[in-house]
């Protein structure tokens, strides 16, 4: 995940990362502190204040979700090459690429060399964005042709396109959507029986189905 610095920041502690306005930072961990992200810039790593940067989100980044949930989501997307990138549950700051092979979901651990570059095989990249762009036109698999493809546009859920929150919900990771009781959420996907994907006030994320009630608008 990449971000752009909105302001310059001078580190005051040894574990902080200084940067200038306009710098592009690689975000390594967004989960462990609500006010600080761990990031990398030109080979140096450290913590940065989240209100000093703007994330460059992508629909393929799913945050810290489980391997099982990744498989459930991708197998319901009925085309080979559907993919997502998730953060490791056990090792924050490490990532995996999960890819629909048509008959199964394959998981690739994203490796990093001593200089901080990302790689799966021989080719190395400065960011996850570059890695994804490369494997859109080069097969990610060794024994078959599998190219990363964005999700095909899905029709909005029939009839009930909106849901009303019955309880407050606080997101546990960036892939989830927080809301308050009474909020009206636009439902974008219902691919998983337990977790839906929706939009509220410009924010998009997953939320528990049991917390909402479909409504007709």
Curated annotation (Swiss-Prot):
SUPFAM superfamilies: SH2 domain, SH3-domain. Keywords: Membrane, Repeat, SH2 domain, SH3 domain, Synapse. GO terms for molecular function: epidermal growth factor receptor binding; phosphotyrosine residue binding. Residues 60-152 form the SH2 domain. Residues 1-58, 158-217 form the SH3 domain. Belongs to the GRB2/sem-5/DRK family. Associates through its SH2 domain with ligand-activated receptors for stem cell factor (KIT) and erythropoietin (EPOR). Also forms a stable complex with the Bcr-Abl oncoprotein. GRAP is associated with the Ras guanine nucleotide exchange factor SOS1, primarily through its N-terminal SH3 domain. Interacts with phosphorylated LAT upon TCR activation. Interacts with SHB. Couples signals from receptor and cytoplasmic tyrosine kinases to the Ras signaling pathway. Plays a role in the inner ear and in hearing. This is GRB2-related adapter protein. It comes from Bos taurus. The gene is GRAP.
């Amino acid at each position: 995940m990449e971000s752009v610095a909105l302001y310059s920041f001078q580190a005051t502690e040894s574990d902080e990362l200084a940067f200038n306005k306009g710098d592009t930072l690689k975000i390594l961990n967004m989960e462990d502190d609500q006010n600080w992200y761990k990031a990398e810039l030109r080979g140096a790593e450290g913590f940065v204040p989240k209100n000093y940067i703007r994330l460059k989100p992508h629909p393929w980044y799913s945050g810290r979700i489980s391997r099982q949930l990744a498989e459930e989501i991708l197998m319901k997307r009925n085309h080979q090459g559907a993919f997502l990138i998730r953060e490791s549950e056990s090792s924050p700051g490490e990532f995996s690429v999960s890819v629909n092979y048509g008959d199964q979901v394959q998981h690739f651990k994203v490796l990093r060399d001593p200089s901080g570059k990302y790689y799966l095989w021989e080719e190395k990249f400065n960011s996850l964005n570059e890695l994804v762009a490369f494997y859109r036109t080069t097969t990610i698999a060794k024994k078959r042709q599998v190219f990363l493809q964005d999700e095909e546009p899905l029709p909005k859920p029939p009839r009930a396109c909106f849901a009303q929150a019955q309880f407050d919900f606080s997101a546990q990771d960036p892939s989830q959507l927080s809301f308050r009781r009474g909020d009206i959420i636009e439902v974008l996907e219902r691919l998983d029986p337990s977790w839906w994907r929706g939009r509220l006030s410009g924010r998009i994320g997953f939320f528990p189905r049991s917390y909402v009630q479909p409504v007709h608008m």
